[in-house]
Every structure is written in structure tokens, then in C-alpha cells.
């Protein structure tokens, strides 16, 4: 299943066009895909122009709305996304992170996304030059390049990646965070999670620059780099968590006592000088007793 997550504000927002987004979803989803896509939308409680229930009832797929305070507006997008993530249908394998000024343009995108077997995956319209920023991604000039290398993106990200990373990057631009995480993953482990999809959406609004004052000194926008460089250390920790889950698996059930991985771990944990003696004792235990 595909969960589409976004925040919408009608009041004072001329770029908002939710009817066009949802109408395009009807046009470009097949009848047997409509139970495989859901929309989770957050509204501000002071937005008295948000659509009524009757507007949403006419659509042939699940649409769930949530309403709470505006807070810091756009700067709080990641907090809203984290909550919407926890409310998604538990069958969902992928998230589409979008906005209410996008609309769909190609039929079949739902089935195409859901056909991807990868447990850890990021999908966008293009494949940015991730490898080009290895070793230099913290430099100010490099940040200005990789931060816009993906274009106007409404990213698809696997649910498992968010479960392992535990958030959407400590700031409101999920596409910038996913690009940064991708660069760090390649820099540390030579792993690339990014896939390119044939374009299936367009945007009528524009970049949300997010340059109004905010408490968050880790905000990353088209014009501003993170003021708190600890953000990059947090990214490296996320990258390591992803790597360890890829290598060791994401199954939370305890391993069998006799599993190869557990036995190898126990073997490696022993001081090397004890191994010959332990092997000798094990061999003795296996010999038949005299008499």
C-alpha cells in the first residue's frame, strides 16, 4: 500500500489546490489500485476555509484528515509528518511525501511504486549525482549543490527507512534530508538507495523557501545551510543504523541460539588466546567416554 502524506492550508495560501491533486489521483489510478492508496492530510485549526466532509466523501479512496494548531507553520512540517506516519495504514510499504500544489500526470504510478521489492528505498524523478559529494558534503559550496540536485521533488520513501531512521530529518524539507542521507550513506558505506521513476507528477506552486524566522537552527532550505553542524553527525548515525539493518536484517524476533550469525558473534567476542583451549575442550567433550 502507498500512503500519501502532506499538510494543507487553504486560508491565505493561493498556491493550494487540493481538488486538482485529488481529481488527478482519480484520473491516474486504476480501479484496482484505489484500495492500495490512501491520503493523510494535516490542517491547521485556524484554517476556516478547509473543505467540509462532503468534499472528501466523493473520492473513491481513503482520505483521513487531522486538525491541530498551526505552530510555526512550514517550519513544523517534519513534526506533522512524523505524526501522520504513525497513523498510516499498517499495510503501507511506501510513503509519498507531497504538498497540495502538486498533481498527478501519469496512470499506473501506484502499481509501479508498489512493485519495487526493496526494503530500503528512495524514489524520485531523477537520479542525482550522489557519488560526486563523497568526502565534501559538509562544505558550504557542496551543500548549495546537493541540496537542489534532485529538482522539484515529491519523494517516495520506504516505510522501513523511516522506521529505522525514526524521523524525517529534524527539519521541514524532507527531500533535502533524503538527499543528505543518501550522500552520507554513499560516503560511509558505498550504498545507494535512490531509484529514478518516470515522472508522474507536476507542481503548480513554487519552492517554499522557509526563510522566515524559526527556532530551528538545523533548517536546510534553498537559501540557507544548517546553522548547527551537529546535524551532520546525526545524519551519520542514521546512516550507520540503516547500514546495520541492511547487513543484519530488520526482523525484531530474537535469533535462534544456533543461528550462524549468533555463533559467529559469540566466537568473535572471545579473546583470541582462549580459542585453542576452548576448541580443545570442545573436542574432548565430543569423544566417547572409556569403559
What residues fall within each predicted segment?
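C-terminal catalytic/acceptor-binding lobe
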Residues: 18, 169-291
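Active-site-proximal specificity loops/subdomain of glycosyltransferases
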Residues: 45-91
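Short acidic, S/G/P-rich loop/turn micro-motifs used as interaction or catalytic elements
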Residues: 9-14, 46-48, 101-104, 129-130, ...
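Short, well-formed alpha-helical segments that are part of the catalytic scaffolds
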Residues: 12-30
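Short beta-strand/turn micro-motifs composed of small residues
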Residues: 6-8, 41-45, 98, 124
